[in-house]
Design a protein with these regions (language model features):
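Intrinsically disordered, low-complexity regulatory segments in ankyrin-centric signaling systems
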Residues: 1-28, 37-40, 198
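Conserved ankyrin/ankyrin-like repeat signature
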Residues: 21, 53-54, 86-87, 119-120, ...
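Ankyrin repeat domain, specifically the short helix-to-loop turn at the C-terminus of the second helix
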Residues: 23-31, 56-64, 89-97, 122-131, ...
């Protein structure tokens, strides 16, 4: 390990979950938030490679958990996108910025709803004040994504129900003026349509 290669050694150590080496690099003065060419910091790399103990060690050492890479990802958004509940439960106590958005303009809840990550949706709605009505760059809320971008199955029905119970509006339309109810019916998702009607749609 040389001072010249310190940033690269540090980032690789985080990716590999080598906490001792990470601590040595920090003791030698490496910038805790240094990043690679993709803009990924050590804590983002540790998160990506599910090096959970290393993620916690970097949080404890004061790493910036909100810094986003060139694709707008950070540990919090990564946990939501990938359905990584273990990572989310490590990150939430560190108080991540819930208003950080993906490159599509959605908060962490949005991709979790789209991809059917029910456990992530439950965790976010139970333990945070995340915006359930955030509209992304294409005009979709988490509720609309849960309907439009998945299969309407049991998991998606549960996500829709949770969103409605936590204040998601059944009236917010997409950019073409279509309501969640119209979009659910267009796709033949009658169970979801009934949930929306019960919520006042």
């Amino acid at each position: 390990m040389t001072i010249k290669n310190l940033p690269a050694d540090y980032l690789l150590a985080a990716q590999q979950g080598d906490i001792d080496k990470v601590k040595i690099c920090l003791a030698l003065g490496v910038d805790i938030n240094t990043c690679d060419r993709q803009g990924k910091t050590a804590i983002t790399l540790a998160s990506l490679y599910q090096q959970y103990a290393c993620v916690q060690a970097l949080i404890d050492a004061g790493a910036d958990i909100n810094k986003q890479d060139l694709t707008c990802l950070n540990p919090f958004l990564m946990s939501c996108l990938n359905g990584d509940l273990t990572l989310l439960r490590i990150i939430l106590p560190a108080k991540p910025d819930l208003n950080c958005v993906t490159r599509f303009g959605g908060v962490g809840l949005t991709p979790a709803c789209e991809k059917g990550h029910l456990s992530i949706v439950k965790e976010l709605l139970a333990h945070t004040e995340i915006n359930v009505n955030q509209t992304n760059h294409v005009g979709w809320t988490p509720l609309l994504e849960a309907i439009v971008l998945n299969d309407g199955g049991i998991k998606q029905q549960a996500i829709v129900q949770l969103l409605l119970e936590h204040g998601a509006s059944p009236h917010l339309t997409d950019k073409y003026g279509k309501t969640p109810l119209e979009l659910a019916r267009e796709r033949g998702f009658e169970e979801i349509a009934q949930l929306l009607i019960a919520a006042g749609a």
